Amino acid sequence: MNPVQQPAQHRSPASLLHLPHPKRAQEAPDMGLYCDNFMFSQQNLHPSQRAPNFSIGGEFTPPANPYLWLGGPGMNNAPNYSPAPAPYIPSAFSAPQRHFMANSAAFGGADLGWMSAASQEELLKMVRPPYSYSALIAMAIQNASDKRLTLSQIYQYVAENFPFYKKSKAGWQNSIRHNLSLNDCFKKMPRDENDPGKGNYWTLDSNCEKMFDNGNFRRKRKPKSESNNAKIAKRDEDHLNPKGKESPPMITPSSSPEVLSPTGHSKSPSPPTVTYTPCLTNFIGSMTAVDSATMNRQSPLGLLNELSQRNITGLSSFISGSAVDQSSEHQDNSLFYNRSPYYTNQKQPHFLQQLHPQQPPLYQGRY
C-alpha cells in the first residue's frame, strides 16, 4: 500500500516530520516584502478570497508619468486586492501609517505616498527629467507671471522643480546659457531704467509657441495654415494661367547658332565650307581634263558612260560653286551629302579596271 494513502494512525513518526503542521489561530500570517510595489503579500489566503482581476500575468498598463514607476499604484489604490473597501493591511496587523505626501505638480501628480519624504528626495535626485534644456527654459518662462525671466530666475526654477539638477550646477547651467544664446525661440529683452537689478530678461518668441509639444522641443516648425485670401489668390492665378497653356520658354543663345524655320523648329547645321589651296585646285582641274578626254572614246556599255558623265558634272559644279563663293552659308545640302564618289585610275574598282586596261598611269614619267 502506498504510504501516502495509509491512515494517520499507521504512519510512522518519521513521515510526520515532513507533513505541514496546522497553524494556530494566534500565529500571524506569512508576509513577504516585494521591492517592485512595496506591498505585503499574504501567502495563506484562500484563492477564493482574492479579486477575480488579480493575476500574476495580468495586463500591465505603463504609467503616463515620465518618471519611471512614480505614477504607479500606491497603497491608496489597494482595494482591488481585497473584497471590501477597507485598507489593504488588516486591522489586526496594522501599524501607525505614514503621512501621505501631497502630489507635486512638477512631477505629473506622482503617487509617492508609500515613500518617506527623504526617500522621495533621494529618488528624484537620481532620476533625470525627460526634458531637453530648451524645454526646461520654455517651461520656466511660460510659468512666469509676466512671461519673462532673468538667467538667475531660470536657474532657480529648474533647481526647485527638478531636484536632479541640484547636485551639479556647473554642467546644466552652461547648457542653459548656450540654449538661450543659440536658439532663436528665446529673445533677449533689456531692462527698463526704472527696474533695478542685474541681467537682461529672456522671453519666448510668439512664433515659436507651437514648437513645444508636451514639454518637448520640436526641431522643425509646424506648417502654418494658409489664410483664405492667399488661397483665393492662388486659385485665381491657376485659373488665369493653366498648366496646359503656359508660354514657351525663351530661347537662349547657344555656342553653335542654328537656323530657325517659320514653324519654330531648328534645321540641321549647314555643311562646313571647304577652302581649297591653289595647288589643290590645279590638281582637280587637271584630273577633270583627263577624264573629259577619256569620255570622248566609244564605250561598249551605256551604264558606264552615264555614271562617268554624272561624276564629271557633279565634280565640276562643286568646284565652280566653291570657287565663286567659298563663304556662302545657303548652298544646297543635297550636293554636299549625295554627290557620287570620284575614282581615279589608280583607285578604280575591279569592274572599272577591266574596261580601261590600256590607260597609262596619270603621273608616269614625271618623277
UniProtKB/Swiss-Prot annotation:
DNA-binding region: 128-222
Protein's GO biological process: anatomical structure morphogenesis; cell differentiation; determination of ventral identity; ectoderm development; nervous system development; positive regulation of DNA-templated transcription; regulation of transcription by RNA polymerase II
Compositional bias per record (Basic and acidic residues), positions renumbered to this chain: 233-246
GO CC term (a single one): nucleus
Bias kind Polar residues: ranges: 252-274
Gene Ontology MF: a single term: sequence-specific DNA binding
Compartments reported by the entry: Nucleus
Region (Disordered): 1-21, 213-274
Organs and tissues of expression: Initially localized to the animal hemisphere (the presumptive ectoderm) of early-mid blastula embryos. Becomes restricted to head placodes, excluding the otic placodes, by the tailbud stages.
Keywords tagged on the record: Developmental protein, Differentiation, DNA-binding, Neurogenesis, Nucleus, Transcription, Transcription regulation
Induction profile: Induced by Bmp-signaling. Suppressed by Wnt-signaling.
Disulfide bridge positions per record: none
Purpose of the protein: Transcription factor. Essential for ventral specification of the early cephalic (head) ectoderm during gastrulation, playing a role in the 'non-neural' versus 'neural' cell fate choice. Binds to DNA via the target sequence 5'-[AG]TAAA[CT]A-3', with 5'-ATAAACA-3' being the preferred binding site.
Name listed for the protein in its UniProt record: Forkhead box protein I1-B
Organism: Xenopus laevis
